[in-house]
Amino acid sequence: VLAGPGWGPVKASYALSIAADGTLEQVTSIQTEQLRGKKTVLAPQVLTLPAPVKRTVGIAANFLCDNSGYILGADNKGNPQRSLACFAACKALHTSVLGGVASPSAQALLAFFRTWIPEYTLEHPALAEYREDILSGANLLFRYNGSYIHEDPEIRRAWERRYRADTDSPRGHLLVTGEEGPVESVHPAIQECGPA
């Protein structure tokens, strides 16, 4: 299944369940068991999420799913100031995209970013079980009221508006739909297709 513009396959390992006031209530592993050789291992689940940015050395946050440095403002990379800067960038992105969205899940996510204190990440009881894996770079996403936040129709529309506004792609004949529209300049990498 091809994702629409602004969406792509993203590996995610943990869901952060938040309350209406933004409080982190629970962390759940969403990893799936996969057979690798003769061993069964836990692997991140691949979900269709807002397209991740291509990172180099700069700070660039992803919308709705990212690692702990961006989502929580803490990681185990040994540079706490950078983690705080990553969190600030992530908070700014979510505030910008969701500022006018009235859905309860959008408001809960905005409350999370307003109230989360990165310096207390290591002490938060909801993170205890998976702390090491989370701080090692596993991707995190959000749940509100039992549902993934990225499935909220209002949030999806807000992301698509933002993505279209940020895209200065030339218009042309689209190969997949046959329609006239903006041509994507960057496509997700094709993975796991054997020797190519």
Description of each model-found segment:
Residues 1-172:
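Conserved phosphate-interacting/catalytic interface
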Residues 174-177:
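Short cysteine-rich clusters marking metal-coordination/redox-active sites
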Residues 179-196:
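Domain-exit/linker segments immediately C-terminal to small folded modules
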